[in-house]
Amino acid sequence: MPMPTVSMSPALTALIERAVARVRQSLPVEQAWPGGEFDRQLAQVALASEFALDTLARQPALLQHLAQPDPPPLPLPQFDPAQPQLWPAQLRRYRSAESTRLVWRDVLGLDSVEATLAGATQLAEHCLQCGLQALEQQFHTRHGKVVAADGSVQRLVVFGLGKLGGGELNFSSDVDLVYAYPQGGQSDGARPLAAEEYFARLGQQLARLLDETTADGFSHRVDLRLRPFGTAGRVALSFAGMDQYFQREGRDWERYAWLKARAVAGDIDAGEAWLETLRPFVYRRYLDFTALDGLREMKAAITAEVARHDRLDDIKRGPGGIREIEFLAQSLQLIRGGREPSLRERRLLPALQALVAAGQIDQENGQALSTAYRFLRRLENRLQMLRDAQTHALPQAPLDRERIALGLGYAQWSALLDALAPQRARVAAEFAELLAPRVRATAPDALADYWRALPDGDAAPLAGIGLNDPDGAHRALADFAQSSGVRALSDSARARLDRVMPALLHAATRASQPDAAVRRMLGLLQATLRRTSYLALLDEQPSALARLVDVLSRSALLAERLAAYPLLLDELLDTRISGPLPDRAALHAACAHTLHIDDTEAALRELNERRLALSFRIALATLDGRQQAVESTRQLAWLAEAVVQTVLHLARSDMLAAHGHVPGGSFAIVGYGSLGGLELGFGSDLDLVFLYDHPREVDASDGKRPLDAGRWFARLAQKVMALLAAETGAGRLYDIDVRLRPDGGKGALVSSLASYREYQRDRAWTWEHQALVRARAVAGDAALCDAFAQVRRDTLMRVRDTAQLHEDVRKMRARMRAELDRSDAGRLDLKQGAGGLVDLEFVLQAGVLGLAAQQPQLLDACDTPALIDALARTHWLPDESAAPLHQAHATLVDAGLSCTLDRRPRLIAPTPAIQQARGIIFNAARGQGLTFPLGKDETAL
């Protein structure tokens, strides 16, 4: 017998020779010995697993199967309903044989660690499914099938938790099961049972079939203790009972347990559908750092158990063990999985990859943890393969140590320990970092004492930290401390608040506007006290706390949005926040992702949350000076465009379901104003115009409830508007203004392409053609969008009388100045004031209207920067004026966006930079004979 090509002790050599000889002796005379390479392979397996050799001695027919180059899975056992007494032996022999095949493939390097874990999982599922199927038939004969009140037949659902649910079962593991059934009822057989008793008995018999140890061993150890109420709970619960339990009794550790849950036998479809309803329990909708509290408690209990039983050599529960990797990944999944569906992953290794992709673990750490996990799981499997024992402890017996080390390719035990130590150390360090004690710059004792003493005490401690109005801040803090929200906090939440408040006050002293920071901070806390997960975030993440106070001090708008939509706090922690912002395609993809949600209301809410988060990122980039305001307004327009396209898809789907579609019909949404001109602000409304077209011979939709074509498209436009303005838990998407449609407020909401073309040709005012310069199709059918673009070109390329054009432009500007300019002697209206943004727009629009007939390339532009460049290329604007006009435009947009971010009206005292920008715009207007009236602001010029 060739022995493995490693140096073994004489004792181990003799042991392997005896094991192989025993297998040879068990071989029937008529069965040929495979021979050749098989001898070496068998000796290699004998080194790693007594269990495998024992199985081969009892089932020598398995030898021929394993002698194949790539031995496939064994056929499932076939249970005879008439001979249930044979089922346990059949199941156990199958499990032993298939487990031996897994050992064979693992030891000989045919399978990766992941494949071995998946194979062990599939084996457990097959045993559960075969056993349950046989028992169900038996129960049908005795008791009939369970029928609910609605007449539907009910089946048992077997949920696999832990590693079974995650598809990563170790070689000799127990299986964590929970039994449930969709609805109550009664069986319809000769000996009827209520559903609860029926499924409890069925589940208990399934557990016994797998778990009992017989002369043939066991199939799988079954653990039912993770069911609701544990050993005190019912063996099987209806889905309604499960729902009630998790709503009222669900605990933090159960979120970890059910994160990996999967329906593995019985009515799998019903089980998976119910698990989807449990998702909000496992993954909270909002950022949830309270998950770390549950993790700390579980880790403390495990640490105590390890110490109590001297289990430092336990590679599962001990320091740097498998459990720490699992806890680390699962805690990050629970914290963010409610917001990021990609993190809702049952399997550990893909979960680590998802966390890296989401920026929650850096690439190097993610790779290190994955490597450590594979190392530990491979070692764990080999420990268990030795004797099919449910062990995670490193062996003490010298011979066992030698077998494990040599089987894994190490010359001696010490070499294996040397390889193991850095893996465990890396895991322990990463896990300790996650659960590290809260580290932050310690707030001065005076502030901590001040907060705890409220409402007693005075403002003296606040006077020394740089507040301009310490008395006002003191009153606000005292009122907050006595508020009903604070008084209603649990002890643990109050303890968090007592840690957070001094740190917040300390951070406020370093803010650019300390008084504003304190005032806005209290508003945010008051709005979020009901969700203690946000207190946990600030308690666990000092960097987020500092960033929050900085943002609050500099932006009243973002302070309001954070208070109204605390889910935005997640953005302060996202490592991607300081990187490049999403481009146009990424914004569209982010919004379109919501279309996979079947429920329109839920899709709308998700879309709004994404819009809020993305606009918040754009605002932070603007606030931090990481990009120019002109870029921010362009991105906001792209975002709005993506939202409108998504909403149109939702609205059209609803219309198709209710009324069918208009054959050959098309629909388009045109963006005017700041949306069309790619210069949208934070909180800006959207100027929209709706167009439609359809073949003349088609006069109605083709659904069950048909509408005439015009009415169908009007309903579609109304639905788009309703969805855009609908209130959701995340607010509403946009305010809509449709007054720029043909005939304004008196006109039809939706225009046919023909009527729109006729209106622009025959009845539109010059100012409407000016508005058309900045218009572009933002959503809808491509052919109609192209047709609109052609109408726009035809309209704007009309030959015009320059004098009349300039007169019309000046009159409209004078009218707007009189009605809309809010400037006064000391402040300029950045948009409507003299030399403001609208003056610049009018100059550019006049240039396009006057020149497009000779220079049609001008019509390729619709936004201010592109229009400046296009008109400069035609020399209508002097070449040397382009750069100054770009700068003037950027200066005014930046000033306006700064006002918006701090919730101030866009009225400011002109600075030298503003005055310079206005002068540039005045000069450009004068150069084209377009001197606009000064209006209210003339004294400031």
Swiss-Prot record:
Biological processes, Gene Ontology terms: regulation of glutamine family amino acid metabolic process
Gene3D superfamilies found in the cross-reference section: 1.20.120.1510, Beta Polymerase, domain 2, Nucleotidyltransferases domain 2
UniProt keywords, alphabetically: ATP-binding, Magnesium, Multifunctional enzyme, Nucleotide-binding, Nucleotidyltransferase, Transferase
GO cellular component, one term: cytosol
Cofactor dependency: Mg(2+)
Keyword Signal: no
Enzyme Commission number(s) of this protein: 2.7.7.89, 2.7.7.42
Keyword Magnesium: yes
InterPro entries, A to Z: GlnE (IPR023057), GlnE_rpt_dom (IPR005190), NT_sf (IPR043519), PII_UdlTrfase/GS_AdlTrfase (IPR013546)
Residue numbers spanned by region Adenylyl removase: 1-437
Catalytic reaction(s) noted: [glutamine synthetase]-O(4)-(5'-adenylyl)-L-tyrosine + phosphate = [glutamine synthetase]-L-tyrosine + ADP; [glutamine synthetase]-L-tyrosine + ATP = [glutamine synthetase]-O(4)-(5'-adenylyl)-L-tyrosine + diphosphate
Region (Adenylyl transferase): 444-941
Origin: domain of life: Bacteria
GO MF term list: [glutamate-ammonia-ligase] adenylyltransferase activity; [glutamine synthetase]-adenylyl-L-tyrosine phosphorylase activity; ATP binding; magnesium ion binding
Function: Involved in the regulation of glutamine synthetase GlnA, a key enzyme in the process to assimilate ammonia. When cellular nitrogen levels are high, the C-terminal adenylyl transferase (AT) inactivates GlnA by covalent transfer of an adenylyl group from ATP to specific tyrosine residue of GlnA, thus reducing its activity. Conversely, when nitrogen levels are low, the N-terminal adenylyl removase (AR) activates GlnA by removing the adenylyl group by phosphorolysis, increasing its activity.
Family that this chain belongs to: Belongs to the GlnE family.
PANTHER family per UniProt: BIFUNCTIONAL GLUTAMINE SYNTHETASE ADENYLYLTRANSFERASE_ADENYLYL-REMOVING ENZYME, GLUTAMINE SYNTHETASE ADENYLYLTRANSFERASE
Protein name: Bifunctional glutamine synthetase adenylyltransferase/adenylyl-removing enzyme
